[in-house]
A protein has these predicted regions:
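Small-residue-biased structural context
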Residues: 1-149
């Protein structure tokens, strides 16, 4: 089982658009619960994740549509692909294959930072520009800068 401490909230994930940051905190908490729970609780957590992801992605997709966010198609397609995988894995977990569910949870933990740093950060900047006319100002606590390769 993956170490649940590997995927916890960090200010590194803050993007500067409050509603998105709040939803991302919830995403991290639910995935972390999936990584660390016993098998008897896993189905409930993955179903909670599916409900969260449906609402999370619908909210972001709505922002992109309502504001005519230029690169929205790729972003929306990625959301749809994640949801499709989640629904497929839920069916496998219902048959008792918790290992497949845990692989999905680990994959979500691996996927989220890249998605947030690339696709969601662009959307966050867009949303702040639409509402306030400029880029978000983000104050992060205890974050060590990543080295660029």
């Amino acid at each position: 089982m993956p170490d649940p401490d590997k995927f916890s909230w960090s200010d590194e994930y803050l993007l500067g658009y409050g509603p998105m940051d709040a939803t991302h905190r919830e995403f991290v908490a639910i995935v972390n619960a999936m990584l660390g729970c016993p098998d008897a609780e896993f189905l409930g957590h993955i179903e909670a994740f599916a409900r969260h992801a449906e609402a999370h992605f619908k909210e972001e997709d709505g922002w992109m549509e309502r504001t005519s966010f230029p690169p929205r198609d790729c972003h929306v397609d990625e959301h749809a692909a994640v949801l499709k995988s989640v629904y497929q894995v839920i069916e496998v977990v219902r048959q008792g294959d918790f290992a497949e569910g845990r692989r999905l949870a680990a994959a979500l933990a691996d996927w989220f930072p890249g998605h947030a740093f690339h696709l969601d950060s662009a959307l966050s900047q867009w949303m702040v520009k639409q509402s306030h006319g400029g880029k978000p100002v983000v104050l992060r606590r205890n974050v060590v800068a990543r080295e660029k390769n």
